[in-house]
Amino acid sequence: MQKARIKLSSTQHTELDGVCNQIKAIAEKTGVDMAGPIPLPTKALKVTTRKSTDGEGSSSFDRWTMRVHKRVIDIEADERTMKHIMKVRIPDTVQIEIELRN
């Protein structure tokens, strides 16, 4: 039987966990084997910009940080389960990637 690896990433960890819980509920309902959700390390993207645009005055900076949270779920990819997963409502802030493996 084929396996599906579902990779999820988002800047909002609460919405990401909500989608993971929906996929977990589908796996329990259909009775397929599932591993995960496995949390991967959070990537912190940092940008530092200078507040003063003209270059005069004291050097003061703004620091911006965006955290990207990731999860991986391995699940048996039978047709019924995959149809249910495709119907899950996914928020705009969550990116999903499904890869089928033998």
Swiss-Prot record:
Superkingdom in the source lineage: Archaea
HAMAP family: Ribosomal_uS10
One annotated GO molecular function: tRNA binding
Keywords, alphabetical: Ribonucleoprotein, Ribosomal protein
InterPro entries per the UniProt record, alphabetical: Ribosomal_uS10, Ribosomal_uS10_CS, Ribosomal_uS10_dom, Ribosomal_uS10_dom_sf, Ribosomal_uS10_euk/arc
Keyword Ribonucleoprotein attached: yes
The keyword Ribosomal protein is assigned to this record: yes
Family designation: Belongs to the universal ribosomal protein uS10 family.
GO biological process annotation, one example: translation
NCBIfam families: uS10_euk_arch
Descriptive protein name: Small ribosomal subunit protein uS10
Function: Involved in the binding of tRNA to the ribosomes.
Subunit (UniProt): Part of the 30S ribosomal subunit.
Gene Ontology CC terms, in alphabetical order: small ribosomal subunit
